UniProtKB/Swiss-Prot annotation:
ATP binds at residues 111-118. Residues 1-48 form the ClpX-type ZB domain. InterPro entries: AAA+_ATPase (IPR003593), ATP-dep_Clp_protease_ClpX (IPR050052), ATPase_AAA_core (IPR003959), Clp_ATPase_C (IPR019489), Clp_protease_ATP-bd_su_ClpX (IPR004487), ClpX_bact (IPR046425), P-loop_NTPase (IPR027417), Znf_CppX_C4 (IPR010603). Coiled coil: none annotated. It comes from Thermotoga maritima (strain ATCC 43589 / DSM 3109 / JCM 10099 / NBRC 100826 / MSB8). This is ATP-dependent Clp protease ATP-binding subunit ClpX. Pfam families: AAA_2, ClpB_D2-small, zf-C4_ClpX. Zn(2+) binds at residues 6, 9, 29, 32. GO terms for cellular component: HslUV protease complex. ATP-dependent specificity component of the Clp protease. It directs the protease to specific substrates. Can perform chaperone functions in the absence of ClpP.
């Protein structure tokens, strides 16, 4: 290759490590390849940053959350600050060799149906980033029947249509994280494959590593080619109900205040959310999470259990409230839907009794409306449908108001 030179930088073969030949006597050297690779990566990062747009301030993030989520003021503030700091860290460190700011993964603790998953989903929508939900329950450590922890990242890749660069700036919500707590604080002869082993396996991914992700889901396809995903800039939000954690917290609070004349509220006097606000990392370790795992979640936010008043507001106030959704469905048929305040309270009361929080609201409403929704398309000249307290109690049918004939 004497006399050959790079068509891009002009250096000859003696000045570079390697010269690669192309068609029509065109050559490119290894240094130009590295340069162009860096340029392409830089362009992709700029594209991703532009897609995420300007990072909203914590106040702006919370204002958007307020449109969809009723109550949970403290949790919304904590999440807004954590997400803002996360993406500020991501984009300030893209080309920086200065101080490295640690990740601000978030742990959400709260009763079932209080909006943990929904909070994470709305955050991703606000920021225009890929979002995926993974269930911690089927995860097991390598070598055991179940799902590999890398499948958590696979969910995000799928949500990003396998655009690796875009996925690397996404949000992953790991649900039921409390289910991988150690079953016992004492080590046993039998391996706890769904507990401590899974926590250990998740550590690297949570902190930031190059994960080898199986595009076809892992163990059933052992010979597939892995996709490398850098998890350093992925925000992990984990959530769980942590049933029984309140007892650990109460015991600690009572032992530290004993003998000082402090008034201890009984369990009946304290709402669950009020107790959970006092959680510490040590409480989580006692619950069954290993210290290293707890350390990967520097931000902890607790959610309040929902009251009847909260559920009434959730029914009608958010941007996508259940009542608004049904009113829109009726509107498409040219019919107004009216739900009285008394009916809303009965619906909220029924949902509260089911013990699954806000997620029960739509079920209760659907059960009440199914017959009306079935009959409505066949009815002519209907102006309005009214849902009263008696209808919500199941004692009467919805009131159908007909249009006056011209």
């Amino acid at each position: 290759m004497a006399g050959k030179f790079c068509s891009f930088c002009g250096r000859d073969i003696q000045q570079v490590e390697r010269l690669i030949a192309g068609p029509n006597n065109v050559y490119i050297c290894n240094e130009c390849i590295d340069l162009f690779h860096d340029l392409l990566r830089s362009d992709r990062k700029v594209r991703i940053k532009n897609e995420i747009k300007e990072i909203p301030t914590p106040a702006e993030i919370k204002a958007e959350l307020d449109k969809y989520i009723i109550g949970q003021e403290r949790a919304k503030k904590v999440l807004s600050v954590a997400v803002y700091n996360h993406y500020k860290r991501v984009f300030s460190n893209l080309d920086s060799n200065d101080v490295e700011i640690e990740k601000s993964n978030v742990l959400l603790i709260g009763p079932t149906g209080t909006g943990k998953t929904y909070l994470a989903r709305i955050l991703a929508k606000i920021l225009n980033v890929p979002f995926a939900i993974a269930d911690a329950t089927p995860l097991t450590e390598a070598g055991y029947v179940g799902e590999d922890v890398e499948n958590v990242v696979l969910r995000l890749l799928e949500a990003a249509n396998f655009d690796v660069e875009r996925a690397q700036y996404g949000i992953i919500y790991i649900d039921e994280i409390d289910k991988i707590a150690k079953k016992s604080p004492n080590p046993s002869i039998t391996r706890d494959v769904s507990g401590e082993g899974v926590q250990q396996a998740l550590l690297k991914i949570l902190e930031g590593t190059i994960a080898n992700v199986p595009p076809q889901g892992g163990r059933k396809h052992p010979y597939q080619e892995f996709i490398k995903v850098d998890t350093r800039n992925i925000l992990f939000i984990a959530g769980g109900a942590f049933d029984g954690l309140e007892e650990i917290i109460k015991r600690r609070i009572q032992s530290t205040t004993m003998g000082f004349g402090a008034e201890i509220k009984s369990k009946k006097e304290m709402r669950l959310g009020e107790i959970l606000k006092h959680v510490t990392p040590d409480d989580l370790v006692q619950y069954g999470l290993i210290p290293e795992f707890v350390g990967r979640f520097p931000v902890i936010a607790t959610l309040d259990d929902l009251s009847e008043d909260d559920l009434v507001r959730i029914l009608k106030e958010p941007k996508n409230a259940v009542v608004r959704q049904y009113q829109k469905l009726f509107e498409i048929d040219g019919v107004k839907l009216e739900v009285t305040d008394e009916a809303l309270r009965i619906i909220a009361r029924k949902a509260l009794k089911r013990g699954t929080g806000a997620r029960a609201l739509k079920n209760v409403f659907e059960e009440m409306m199914i017959d009306m929704m079935f009959e409505l398309p066949n009815l002519k000249n209907v102006e309005k449908v009214v849902i009263t307290e008696e209808v919500a109690l199941g004692k009467e049918k919805p009131i159908v108001v007909m249009r006056e004939s011209a």
